[in-house]
Swiss-Prot record:
Protein family: Belongs to the Gfa family.
Pathway terms, separated by semicolons: One-carbon metabolism; formaldehyde degradation; formate from formaldehyde (glutathione route): step 1/3
Keyword Membrane: no
EC class: lyase
GO BP, sorted A to Z: formaldehyde catabolic process
NCBIfam families for the chain: formald_GSH, PRK05417.1
Catalysed reactions listed for this entry: S-(hydroxymethyl)glutathione = glutathione + formaldehyde
Protein name, entry field: Putative glutathione-dependent formaldehyde-activating enzyme
InterPro entries: CENP-V/GFA, Formald_GSH, Mss4-like_sf
Amino acid sequence: MPSIHPSIDNGITKGNPNFKGGKLYCHCPTRKVEVTLASNVAHNHACGCSKCWKPKGALFSVVGVVPKDAVSVTANGDKLHIIDESAAIQRNACKECGVHLFGRIVVDHPFKGLDFVHTELSPQKGWQEPQFAAFVSSIIEQGFKPSEMDAVREKFRKVGLQPYDVLSPALMDLIATYTAQKSGKLPSKL
């Protein structure tokens, strides 16, 4: 089976709940884009969607969220560009190496105010470990054989990650709550 993700293939390393953040770097040999995160990530997960940046040969990305106010570009920001300005998550990638450093939501959205980041781009240890796998079936859209999907889901379960074809139940509940509040079916403050 191809690599799920380098940080998952051989088991998951537990993060440090007291970890305070670190720096992310693009893959350029010189003039690396540097992004500083002033907090640990939350909801870190394997993602099979076709939009997320993935390491070479990996079927999934590993991506978590941090408050947007905890994200700052601290070196070579001139090398960043937004991959698709029409997407809900505006992925800021290095123009030279293509690595996505952070994704920001600027439209009205349940996750607005949170930035999506790939902690594998950090040399620091202690980031929250992946909590679940999302959009698992989406790897089929990228050419993965449907007949091999059971093995992918079993690999996730074997390392302790629940595979979902959407987000985790807690995140789906947040989206549904946001939608109900916007429509007036629930009060704006619960």
